[in-house]
Amino acid sequence: MSFGQFIALASFVLSMGTIALTYAVGTAEGSAALCNPFFDGCTDITHTGMKGDAGFIFRGGMIAACSFFVIWWMVMRVWLAGSNRIALSVMQFFGVLAALGLLAGTAVLLPEKADTHWGVHVRGANLFFQGMLFALTINYVLIFRARKRGFVVPSFIFKTSLIAVLWFMFIGFAGVTVGVEMSHGKRIIEWWTTLFIGLYFLSSWWDWKGIQLSVNEASGK
């Protein structure tokens, strides 16, 4: 497994694995409603990871995942080093900003609603979804152009499908916005959008197979 593959896999497993484990623990402890949230929308992601052991798992796992998101964007920039430098900088800036927004929004979650800084959480979560969509879109455009120049992208069709679905949900459902209280429809969109973003991170597993990155390359030197 190359360094890049490890980052792609860890980004997906830490994020989606944490959410899955949190939900399992939350339902077992009775702090989260039991359903298929992807279709029923009985709960949002935030409220599955606030109380009890589920809260500790969620905060620890998602904060760790955010750190890997940041590294993922660094690796992606190195991989697309032949692309426009300004576009790469904008892509990385918004990707990292989105990850930091999620980190801040997760860090302020506390077991009791009254103790949680909801303003920080809501802004951080919305920054993640909207900033990440913008960064991933730039990333896809750069990959599309690089591929036309002969750049090999094994996951291109998969990435195309994910970007298309993400934009369909964003436009068709008036964007992905997180609030303290959300409708069933918004909750469903939140679950699916989170999954598709995670899968986009994972898709780089196939692109970065066999690619080894040195410390100097990863830092852009």
Can you say where each PLM-predicted feature lies in the sequence?
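Membrane-proximal helix-loop-helix units in multi-pass membrane proteins
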Residues: 98-152
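Membrane-interface helix-boundary motifs at transmembrane edges
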Residues: 78-90, 145-156
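Alpha-helical transmembrane segments of multi-pass membrane proteins
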Residues: 13-35
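Interfacial helix-start motif at the membrane-water boundary
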Residues: 43-66
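Terminal transmembrane helical module of multi-pass membrane proteins
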Residues: 139-221
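Alpha-helical transmembrane segments and their helix-start/interface "positive-inside/aromatic belt" motifs
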Residues: 1-16, 156-160
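Hydrophobic cores of alpha-helical transmembrane segments in multi-pass inner/ER membrane proteins
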Residues: 58-71, 128-141, 193-207
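Juxtamembrane "helix-exit" motif on the non-cytosolic side of transmembrane helices
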Residues: 78, 107-115, 172-182
